[in-house]
């Protein structure tokens, strides 16, 4: 019997079998959670259905988080299947490729800035707002961040601003929803090799630097993030809310590695 037995959790942001969201889904499934998946576009539909079948997931629903009505439909459909549920994984971020390289000030536009923060940050609180009435007491809401929210990472640019906004969202949401027994946290992991990560210019250089500066000199894996997410979705972590949990081998505290 897993420690997520009888928990019903929605996982968003799955795009392929290598995605962090699917790694989290596998960890939740391993602990016997009942899952639902959402997907963004029809282009992803068949792939997400395949991955859902792999884990025995019965509920797969489209959702465009830039559209409030689409978010409302997502949770209306969830409520028809589950009535109430125990939380969701927000693994959603977006930035045009041209915003992930070069000079931040020169390349940024008002439209891109607005769209990136809307999809990458507002969507988290927008989803919470839409499903608040059907969340059980003791539910857990979890999102994914990165150290680029606090420190400058070359080429991360507007995504750093979006992640800073997202982390502030976590704190204010935790404050608002705590009286309902709902916890809100984020995982901030090291860079992980996924298809989307390679949109960031010089990603391999960032990856190698992070690994060399980590205290254990190891790459952070999707499994590392998934196991932490499973814990944060469980009652084992009921005393943790409003936190940014680092899963980065200690990189965030390191000014200089032992090998330097």
Curated annotation (Swiss-Prot):
Substrate binds at residue 95. This is Enoyl-[acyl-carrier-protein] reductase [NADH] FabI. The gene is fabI. One of its GO terms (biological process) is biotin biosynthetic process. Catalyzes the reduction of a carbon-carbon double bond in an enoyl moiety that is covalently linked to an acyl carrier protein (ACP). Involved in the elongation cycle of fatty acid which are used in the lipid metabolism and in the biotin biosynthesis. It comes from Buchnera aphidicola subsp. Baizongia pistaciae (strain Bp). Pfam families: adh_short_C2. Its EC number is 1.3.1.9. The active site is at residues 146, 156. InterPro entries: Enoyl-ACP_Rdtase_NADH, NAD(P)-bd_dom_sf, SDR_fam. Homotetramer. It is an enzyme of class 1 (oxidoreductase).
């Amino acid at each position: 019997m897993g420690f997520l037995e009888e928990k019903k959790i929605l996982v968003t942001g799955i795009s392929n079998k290598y995605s962090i969201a699917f790694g989290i889904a596998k960890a939740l499934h391993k602990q016997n959670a009942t899952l639902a998946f959402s997907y963004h576009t029809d282009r992803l539909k068949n792939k997400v259905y395949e991955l859902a079948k792999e884990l025995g997931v019965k509920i797969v629903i489209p959702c465009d988080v830039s559209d409030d009505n689409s978010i409302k439909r997502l949770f209306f459909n969830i409520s028809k299947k589950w009535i109430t549920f125990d939380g969701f994984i927000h693994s959603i971020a977006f930035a045009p490729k041209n915003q992930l390289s070069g000079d931040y000030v020169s390349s940024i536009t008002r439209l891109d800035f607005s769209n990136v923060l809307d999809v990458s940050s507002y969507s988290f609180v927008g989803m919470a707002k839409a499903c608040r009435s059907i969340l059980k007491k003791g539910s857990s809401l979890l999102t994914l961040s990165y150290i680029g929210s606090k420190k400058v990472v070359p080429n991360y640019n507007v995504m750093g601003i979006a992640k800073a906004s997202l982390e502030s969202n976590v704190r204010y949401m935790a404050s608002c929803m705590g009286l309902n027994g709902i916890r809100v946290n984020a995982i901030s992991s090291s860079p992980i090799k996924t298809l989307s990560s390679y949109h960031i210019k010089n990603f391999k250089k960032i990856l190698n630097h992070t690994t060399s500066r980590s205290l254990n000199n190891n790459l952070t894996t999707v499994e590392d993030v998934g196991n932490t997410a499973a814990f944060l979705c469980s009652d084992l972590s009921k005393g943790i809310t409003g936190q940014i949990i680092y899963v980065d081998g200690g990189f965030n505290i390191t000014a200089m590695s032992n090998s330097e």
